Amino acid sequence: MQILPAVLEKDGKSFTRQIKNLSHYFQTFQVDVSDGKFTKNKTAQIDEITESIYKEKLNIKHLTFDFHLMVYNYREEIEKIKKLSKLVNVGYILIHKATNPSLDYLTSSRNFSSGLVLDIKDKVDDLPKKYNLDLVPIIQIMTVNIGYQGTPFMAKMLEKIDDLKELGYKNKIYLDGGINNQTIPLILNRKYRPDGLGIGSFLTRNENIKQTVSYLKSL
């Protein structure tokens, strides 16, 4: 399983501080972006992140950022990400199913690879009604109510991995939300495991970072 630090910060300065702290251990990150409307919590915006990287003259082109867009206007955010892509490698763009992105938009060529995010209320069985899942490169399953780090893990959401596999989905499956040393055993005990784990406060708010990284990389 790939481990991705999920970076959810309130401003550009806090964001770059986290990247500098964690880039000693990781090359790929998941950047949480919330507009304060799709969720109540507003994070550092992409323009702020870009400005902070420029201001601090960070040389991080070797790092890859996936973007988890907790926003209504994902098209506008993707235009901002295009500008940021001059400074970092951009991996996956993760768009919430609730914002109703079309399959054509997800699969069209825009230099980035886009996938779906399933919220707590989203049902896997509804996906084939709108999407050819063979063409969706990644699906991220939320295991918490979105917007804040440190909210309770919902183990029942792990059943969605089974549901996707039973539908014949063969592309990447990520989990995000409430993942730590208490909940990881629940994930590892499943018949099907995810391809990636977005790790938030367990990494970003942890005082024993070296020990935590060692544990995560041993999975």
Where are these regions (language model features)?
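A short alpha/beta connector and helix-capping loop motif
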Residues: 37-74, 78-80, 184-204
